[in-house]
A protein has these predicted regions:
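Amphipathic alpha-helical segments of the small helical/lid subdomains adjacent to P-loop NTPase cores
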Residues: 1-40, 73
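Extended alpha-helical interface modules used as scaffolds for assembling large macromolecular complexes
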Residues: 32-260
Length: 260
């Protein structure tokens, strides 16, 4: 706060805290990211300075190719929610591909997550995790945007058709999005046919959360019973219509056509 006062930015104290606070060094809590706060003092504009200093390629790969559960947690993080889990004190890189707790431990150690609360039971620590700050949230949003803009160009056209209520175009572009996304989120582990639709669905929801932020509140039912996945878009402004999307997995053995 003294530094902000010295630069004539006392009125920006709360915003600076939301953007760059949240780090811990040993027993020191609520530490500001020195690189980000220094750049902010110089440029006087709130931007993700630290998050843009590296490609974050490993983090992106872990989330993009991760299980549906990992993507669901990322949905919650982007919505400002928390996630409770046990953590591994020692991060073993060989475990990142199959052990979800190792992924969250790495993100915590890397400064992308912070511990909001924790409990110790039976000698085991369980932590409540949240995104570290606004800078990190924007970094993850930008990461998701790049996934779809670079590898699934039809996605943007689908969103436009959705908002314009163009059902014919929606069907055309959704097929393209599905085909491109299946391969893009493929980790090379040959997931089962049952798992493939869920991998697509949760990647798709992440894209909606980012693409429609500020215009719609996006929620998913998280349940895939009988091959159905639902997404509800609640308008934040009275001029937009509410939208409910239902995805159904086509079973050729039970259905002769999609219309059935």
């Amino acid at each position: 706060s003294e530094v902000l006062k010295e630069y004539g930015l006392s009125g920006k104290k709360e915003m600076a805290r939301q953007w760059y606070d949240g780090f811990s060094f040993g027993d020191k809590k609520n530490m500001y990211n020195p690189w980000s706060i220094t750049n902010y003092l110089d440029k006087r504009v709130f931007l993700p300075y630290w998050a843009n200093t590296s490609s974050n390629s490993l983090v992106g790969k872990l989330i993009r190719e991760g299980t549906p559960d990992i993507k669901m947690v990322m949905e919650d993080f982007l919505l400002g929610k928390s996630f409770c889990t046990r953590l591994d004190e020692q991060v073993v890189f060989s475990q990142l591909a199959y052990k979800e707790s190792a992924v969250w431990s790495l993100l915590l150690a890397g400064g992308y997550l912070k511990i909001k609360n924790y409990t110790v039971e039976g000698g085991k620590t369980r932590c409540e995790l949240v995104l570290t700050n606004e800078e990190v949230r924007l970094m993850f949003e930008g990461m998701v945007e790049e996934w779809f803009s670079e590898f699934t160009p039809a996605y943007g056209r689908f969103i436009k058709a959705l908002l314009c209520d163009d059902k014919k175009a929606m069907n055309i572009y959704m097929n393209k999005v599905a085909l491109e996304t299946f391969s893009f989120f493929d980790a090379g582990k040959k997931p089962s046919e049952e798992a493939e639709p869920e991998r697509f669905y949760h990647g798709f929801v992440l894209g909606l959360l980012v693409e429609l932020r500020g215009r719609y509140a996006v929620t998913s039912n998280r349940e895939s019973g009988y091959g159905r996945y639902d997404v509800m878009l609640e308008p934040l402004k009275g001029t937009d219509d509410a939208i409910i999307l239902e995805f159904k997995v086509h079973d050729p053995e039970e259905e002769s056509t999609l219309e059935d």
